[in-house]
Curated annotation (Swiss-Prot):
Protein name stated in the entry: DNA gyrase inhibitor YacG
Originating species: Yersinia enterocolitica serotype O:8 / biotype 1B (strain NCTC 13174 / 8081)
Biological role: Inhibits all the catalytic activities of DNA gyrase by preventing its interaction with DNA. Acts by binding directly to the C-terminal domain of GyrB, which probably disrupts DNA binding by the gyrase.
The family this protein is said to belong to: Belongs to the DNA gyrase inhibitor YacG family.
One Pfam family of this chain: YacG
Gene Ontology terms, MF aspect: DNA topoisomerase type II (double strand cut, ATP-hydrolyzing) inhibitor activity; zinc ion binding
UniProt feature, compositional bias: Acidic residues: 55-68
Keywords on record: Metal-binding, Zinc
Gene responsible for this protein: yacG
Length: 68
């Protein structure tokens, strides 16, 4: 039984990375690329889009809404 080798591109540099135990930083090719990506998120160069912004007047809760 042959195991299919899955290859992905490093999101930072584009280098091909084998998706497996031999690639501990997957999907990144190395620790450096992983840290570059983390820095971009920390500097808010990357963000997850939303429908709108929460303001201080918006009501929200960290509680599970199903428990009310």
């Amino acid at each position: 039984m042959e195991t299919e080798v899955i290859e992905v591109n490093c999101p930072t540099c584009g280098k091909i990375v084998i998706w497996g135990e031999q690639s501990p930083y997957r999907p990144f090719c190395c620790k450096r690329c992983q840290l570059i990506d983390l820095g971009e998120w920390a500097d808010e160069e990357k963000r997850i889009s939303s429908n709108g912004e929460l303001s201080d007047s918006d009501e929200w809760s960290e509680e599970d809404p199903l428990q009310h």
